[in-house]
């Protein structure tokens, strides 16, 4: 059976420990594009944190439900309000999963947003946003110690967040 959840695989030259530390430092990589604000704990089992972006366009609350140091982290989305969607709570009940493994002398990060599937309204915009945060900001944090700070909000093709062409 084919996995239809949104998934991104990244390979880096850093150790699993450095990768895990970067992932837990959510404020440093899930930011820089839409006036994001993150409050709460992002490192320990049962920590809860909120993510707000786009001046009220996106709100979600995540709970860390599984942590295997240097190998895996799972967030359960317990609340969501994505104001650019008809079904604003589309993320509620979904899981955001980071799996870390050694691949020779490199480290692989397998990111899966379980429940973010092509049939839901958010799929295109949310998968584009995840790709941007992961492939630019998280990778930059892992490789250079600093999350990416975008200069243009409309860098996410097709995004409905403020400043994008679909919203204007």
Model-predicted segments: where are they?
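Aromatic-glycine hotspot motif
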Residues: 2-16, 65, 90, 101-107, ...
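Hydrophobic pocket/interface hotspot
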Residues: 19-23, 49, 64, 75, ...
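Hydrophobic-ligand binding "helix-grip"
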Residues: 31, 40, 57-104, 114
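A conserved amphipathic terminal alpha-helix motif
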Residues: 115-168
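Intrinsic-disorder/low-complexity, polar/charged segments enriched in Ser/Thr/Lys/Arg/Asp/Glu/Gln
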Residues: 3-9, 48, 59, 72, ...
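Short beta-edge strand/loop motif at the mouth of beta-sheet-based domains
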Residues: 7-8, 18, 25-61
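Solvent-exposed residues in well-ordered beta-strands and their adjoining turns
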Residues: 11-15, 52, 78, 101-103, ...
């Amino acid at each position: 059976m084919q996995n239809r959840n949104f998934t991104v695989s990244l390979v880096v030259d850093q150790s699993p420990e450095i990768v895990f530390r970067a992932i837990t430092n959510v404020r440093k990589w899930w930011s820089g594009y839409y006036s994001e604000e993150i409050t709460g704990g992002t490192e320990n089992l049962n920590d809860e944190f909120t993510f707000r972006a786009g001046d009220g366009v996106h709100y979600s609350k995540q709970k860390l439900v599984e942590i295997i140091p240097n190998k895996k982290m799972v967030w359960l989305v317990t609340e969501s309000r994505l104001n650019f969607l008809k079904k604003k709570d589309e993320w509620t009940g979904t899981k955001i999963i980071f799996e870390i493994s050694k691949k020779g002398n490199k480290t692989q990060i397998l990111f899966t947003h379980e429940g973010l599937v092509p049939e839901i309204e958010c799929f295109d915009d949310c998968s584009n946003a995840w790709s941007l945060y992961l492939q630019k900001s998280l990778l930059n944090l892992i490789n250079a110690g600093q999350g990416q700070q975008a200069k243009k909000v409309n860098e996410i093709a097709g995004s409905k967040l403020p400043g994008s062409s679909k919203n204007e």
